Amino acid sequence: RRISAVYDGYSVDGGVDLPEELELCDAGDIFVIPGNIEKTFDQVSKAISHIFCSGAFPIICGGDHSLGYPNVRGIAPHIDGNVGIIHIDRHIDMQDMDMDERMHTTPWFWTTNDHEGVERNTSHHNHSHMHDVGLSNCPPKNLVQMGIGGWYGSRPGSSVARERVIAALNELNI
């Protein structure tokens, strides 16, 4: 994408020029299917999987509150062992439902939902979706959330994070 070429990759503090040290590529946006969360999640997971299988390590920036789950779902099947997730955001995104939606502000609840000791909420199961269960190699202990806080946090999500012993760091802890 042309906008990526506008920015300089040199760090004055570190004395490092990222484009000289690393092979970087902006893969662009992944197209979504408005109004269809399942097809959108499939599209996102396939794109991330393709990037990962090409030998690149995806660093994913942007999107909405739901995309954490399909991003990790695209990588998790290709990882031997557990996946580590670093989530940088002000929102904890750990509750099971929000505004009657299962993926708005909820991706990390569902990503880490398939592990021993995790109490699964199935009260919404009058329908079934492929993301009703977590990813088996994404344990809660491997999720680190940085920058969490402010007045737009979530009491239910914070409670789930404490129950699952998620490392949720606010700006004072970083």
List the model feature ranges, each with a label:
Residues 1-174:
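Conserved alpha-helical scaffold segments that buttress catalytic/binding sites
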